[in-house]
A protein has these predicted regions:
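Active-site phosphate-binding/coordination module
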Residues: 18-109
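A general structural motif
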Residues: 1-2, 34, 56, 117, ...
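Walker B beta-strand of ABC/ABC-like P-loop ATPase nucleotide-binding domains
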Residues: 6-7
Length: 238
């Protein structure tokens, strides 16, 4: 019996980087009366929380390197953070080698984006690239998936994801959404067969892929506008 339902945000509950709409919020409210709900995201907890309009829910961020527990008194999140030291010289050298190998030597801004948590982003077009250029670079992810295995091998100490529109996101091992969700479930007394995960990015290199390939029940949402229909079809509100 499912007791804990976890959700991705962008593409699953919302359009990318847009606010949670009323219809999907109402479905979450109905689900919260029957199940324990949690968000599992690639971004920071407070960004996810704000995008959801302060919906009362725990939020796991940065692939499990951040956890926000909803505080009913403050109507906000109490944040716990983990961080892993990053060898910036090594990372920079490895990214540079990949650029030279695949011809990505022209870029705007920084070669690598380093995050306080220890996560890193390899922005193929650079950290200050034009938004339109980023959107046009690899809309179907085929260019990045073509070199994905090589990037994974070069960064074997990280879990690598085909992120955004023109980058690779990397989290220090063992952090990924599966690790984060299983850890949260164990801390809250849930077994794997009591969990369902709802996500859209389950393809090769996607940040939901690790959960999709696990034994956790996975609910595919390929269009966030169909989220209510999919939830009803799965029988969660019957």
């Amino acid at each position: 019996m499912i007791k804990l339902i976890a959700f991705d945000l962008d593409g699953t509950l919302t359009q990318h980087k847009t606010m949670l709409e009323t219809e999907n919020r109402n479905v979450l409210t109905a689900l919260s009366e029957r199940y324990h709900l949690v968000m599992v995201g690639a971004g920071a907890c407070m960004r996810i929380f704000r995008q959801m309009g302060g919906f009362p829910i725990d939020v796991i961020g940065n692939y499990g390197m951040q956890k926000g527990i909803y505080n009913d008194r403050t109507k906000s999140l109490d944040i716990e953070e983990a961080s892993v030291p990053c060898d910036k010289e090594s990372v920079d050298a490895r990214v540079t080698a990949l650029r030279e190998k695949y011809g990505f030597t022209e870029f705007s801004g920084d070669n690598v984006q380093f995050h306080a948590s220890g996560c890193i982003t390899f922005p193929i077009l650079g950290t200050t690239a034009n938004a339109a250029d980023k959107l046009e670079f690899d809309p179907d992810r085929s260019r990045r998936r073509a070199i994905y295995d090589d990037v994974c091998e070069v960064f074997s100490d990280y879990n690598v994801f085909v992120g955004g529109s023109s980058s690779f996101d990397m989290a220090p091992r063992p952090y990924d959404k599966r690790y984060a969700l299983e850890k949260y479930a164990a801390e809250n007394g849930y077994t794997l067969d009591e969990i369902a995960y709802v996500g859209d990015d389950y393809g090769r290199g996607g940040n939901d892929e690790a959960v999709y390939k696990s034994n956790i029940r996975f609910i595919k949402v390929d269009d966030y506008r169909k989220f209510p229909e999919i939830i009803n079809a799965e029988g969660f509100l019957n």
